[in-house]
């Protein structure tokens, strides 16, 4: 039909985009073994987000079998978001440890009549405690994210999703150059 002819290139482009997001997500997976790689952890979260949102848009075409993939992506995205929050906390607390920052706080406390000797030591102790708490949380979340990726999400993304995309492409009535490339990849 005329409508199918119009939609085919759009669907093929969407399938290529999804594959690109899958490739991007899997490329960041090794960073889950590297605790000191917050920029790639954040990039992996964003890649999961792009893939999830694209799949949500295409859910009517992919059908209910895409639900487990969407659920796994949402859970992973949440874990990675919590990990990112810990990493931001640690960066902010490190900046707060800076002597200039502490001196400024001390001055403001003196102006407020709160004194500074006990306050400075208390603040440093509180910062130290928060840093340790966030480091422990970061380590736990990174371990959980690594486990989740290897035990659940990797399978969903690389096998189930790839299969769903292939099945959807096969339902297209007319073969095209883009569709043949996509099928050859699978």
Q: Where on the chain are the PLM-derived regions?
A:
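Cationic, histidine-enriched alpha-helical/coil surfaces that engage anionic ligands
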Residues: 1-186
